[in-house]
A protein has these predicted regions:
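Active-site region of glycoside hydrolase catalytic domains
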Residues: 1-53, 58-59, 102-104, 113-481
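A common structural microfeature
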Residues: 9-11, 72, 89
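Active-site mouth loops of central-metabolism enzymes
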Residues: 60-74, 151-154
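Internal amphipathic alpha-helical repeat/solenoid segments
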Residues: 68-80, 101, 112
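Catalytic domains of carbohydrate-active enzymes, especially glycoside hydrolases
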Residues: 74-95, 307-313
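Glycine-rich, proline-tolerant flexible connector loops at the mouths of alpha/beta enzymes
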Residues: 94-108
Length: 481
């Protein structure tokens, strides 16, 4: 890379989620959350997609989220390591069920809030800017089993109470917030963001669209509350973005690619950024067999959306995808996040995710051109099988190569004109995978001695990438060697 395009004040850091690292699932008066009933292992998605899935803990399975990496008892050690790397920011989430154990209480659990007081203060002690996701795949289980999850409009009020509580408490300590993690991911696995699976309504697409609407309105309420509490707060949306290519120049594939982008990348973003439903909404719903009249909404809710768009766009980027509707029996990717036709020009990770740094540059340009808002890459990284030596050292050049190429792509996108706020690679410390419930799928700069069954010393060890990323931050992205 010939020039360093990263602006002064660029937010370098790392990202995690409460349910994937905290553990202590029954400590501090915490209630059960959705991830507490999701079994571990590669069969996780298959099990929870079953029509018989009952949202209960089954003793025949293991539940890695119960333990996480025990960050609940190690957070000071972990944040000290982040500070040693030079983090300017740290993205994490507040577990809803730690603050409101059932989700529908009027008053919060003070013990849960005191934990986050300590986490935030520890970050500020090292001049690390907290970046908080209000809801990250960890809604209270009670809201699913008793209220039917986000199809029920009552959840807007429960979320509003949760958001108001944390936004008020941390109004002078936390500037950057996001409303819902990867809200558009419900198009692929609605259980994680909406609490819906085949056993409780995900088979009917109108439930997904109704849940989205209710989440959009709840998110707009959070934006309104945050700006009223502290006008300097920056509250963003957070989406999963996959750059999408047409297989060829056949107009049918080109049209399918456009519609794929509308459905997967743009719909949820359009509503939250522009403050209104896009012109293609009726057509999009129709493709899923849903009528506008199926959705319960009113003018007051639409007005709330219009008056409270987000301040920035946070997004995850892991891969690109290829759309082909004109050929049968095409080789497909075996990734567990999204399907699609295999791209012969790209390599793939150990989990079949196609590696495409140029796709990140394209994503930043597409989002910048469409929305003209600041962009924050809050997830990106390589999930890999790390093999430590006898001294627990991981020589992860493969991870360094992945990150280097993606950081170069960000720099090039900034040169193209994209307004990029920061970069927080996912799983900066090894944690439990959301999609598979495994520890063996590792992203971190820090190795945690723990296996897929939750056994180990839980000791932390620096990987080779730890010192490399420290150098990247020290030079504000100038030295990627």
């Amino acid at each position: 890379m010939k020039t360093n395009n990263f602006p002064k004040g660029f937010l370098w850091g790392g990202a995690t989620a409460a349910n994937q690292l905290e553990g202590a699932y029954q400590e501090g008066c915490k209630g059960l959350s959705l991830p507490d009933v999701l079994p571990g292992g590669k069969e996780r998605m298959k099990i929870i997609a079953s029509p018989d899935f009952d949202f209960k803990i089954d003793p025949k399975y293991t539940y890695p989220n119960h333990v996480g990496i025990d960050h609940y008892h190690h957070f000071k050690e972990d944040i000290k390591l982040f500070a040693e790397m030079g983090f300017k920011c740290y993205r994490f989430s507040i577990a809803w069920s730690r603050v409101f154990p059932n989700g529908d209480e009027e008053q919060p659990n003070e013990e849960g809030l005191k934990f986050y007081d300590a986490v935030i203060d520890e970050c500020l002690k090292y001049d690390i800017e907290p970046v908080i996701t209000i809801s990250h795949y960890e809604m209270p289980l009670h809201l699913i089993t008793e209220y039917g999850s986000w199809t029920n409009k009552k959840l807007m009020g429960f979320y509003e109470n949760f958001a108001r509580t944390v936004l008020t408490r941390y109004k002078d300590k936390v500037k950057y917030w996001m409303t819902f993690n990867e809200i558009n991911s419900a198009a692929h696995f609605p259980i994680m963001s909406q609490g819906l699976t085949l056993s409780n309504g995900a088979g009917d697409k109108k439930n997904i669209y109704q849940s989205w609407h209710n989440q959009f309105v709840a998110g707009a309420k959070a934006v309104k509350i945050g700006h009223e509490i502290n006008p300097d707060m920056q509250i963003g949306c957070m989406i999963l973005y996959a750059t999408t290519y047409s297989y060829d120049s056949d107009p049918k594939n080109q049209l399918a690619t456009l519609q794929n982008n509308q459905a997967n990348n743009f719909f949820c973003t359009d509503v939250q950024v522009r403050g209104h439903y896009p012109a293609y909404t009726k057509s999009l719903l129709a493709r899923d067999g849903v009528e506008l009249s199926d959705i319960d909404y009113n003018d007051e809710e639409l007005d709330l959306l219009a008056k409270n768009p987000v301040d920035y766009i946070g997004f995850s980027y892991y891969m690109s995808s290829v759309v082909d509707v004109t050929h049968e029996n095409q080789e497909t990717t075996n990734g567990n996040l999204m399907g699609g036709v295999k791209n012969p020009f790209l390599k793939a990770s150990d989990w079949g995710w196609q590696i495409d740094p140029t796709g990140l540059r394209i994503a930043l340009n597409e989002l910048s051109d469409r929305y003209e808002k600041p962009l924050f890459i809050v997830e990106n990284g390589l999930g890999a099988i790390d093999k430590p030596d006898e001294n627990h050292y991981v020589d992860d050049d493969y991870r360094i190569d992945y990150l280097r190429e993606h950081i170069e792509a960000i720099s090039e996108a900034i040169s193209d004109g994209a307004d990029v706020m920061g970069y927080t690679p996912w799983g900066c410390i090894d944690l439990v995978s959301a999609s598979t419930g495994e520890m063996s799928k590792r992203y971190g700069f820090i190795y945690v001695d723990e296996d897929d069954e939750g056994n180990g010393t839980f000791d932390r060890y620096k990987k080779r990438s730890f010192d490399w990323y420290k150098k990247v931050i020290d030079t504000n992205g100038a030295d990627l060697a």
